[in-house]
Amino acid sequence: ALTDLATHNTRVCNAAATAIAWGVAQAMRGEENLDKIVDATIEAAAEGAKYGFSIPSPDIGMRIALACDIVRKAKDDQQALHDLYAMFGGGDLSADSIPSAIALFLLGKGDVKKTLEYCVNFGGDCDTNGAMAGAMVGAMAGIDAVPQVWRDKISEMNACNFSKDADEILALIPQWHVASESDVADLIK
């Protein structure tokens, strides 16, 4: 998540980027418990918020918790979607999009197709929400959980190779580590 420092070096942006990056990392490392992944995103947001310039902004971790509580308390998926949209809308501010994407990930219950359909139909900045929630659920469920027709269409339209890209990312896992204070200090000098 330190990659956002070059262009978005604010506490709120660092919290947002760290939450999504750590959620994806937890899923890639094999965590299958959705609540544990959500909790990890909240903890990561708090850690990321320690770095960058302070600007007036909401607390990303608190908003993730609120969004996920909306999903957990809803009587069904449609109520969850309605209430989530009523609270956060489909906007592109990280204070809205990050909590929404993580809540949509939770609502999809590990089902890639359902999660992405919820994101697309949520409205607003649906491609960004789909990319974030899709990265988390895709990392958890694996490439085979993404319908082949979707992979083919995305590869055709965007000249990308999911399998090659995934293999390259997976090869990096042994090199991952949690950034230390000195790592961050070196980057922002």
What are these regions (language model features)?
Residues 24-123:
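Accessory "access/gating" subregions that flank catalytic or transport cores
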Residues 1-12, 18-26, 96, 100-182:
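Catalytic phosphate/nucleotide-handling subdomain of diverse soluble enzymes
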Residues 183-189:
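Bulky hydrophobic segments
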Residues 36, 40, 59-62, 66, ...:
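Exposed alpha-helical structural elements
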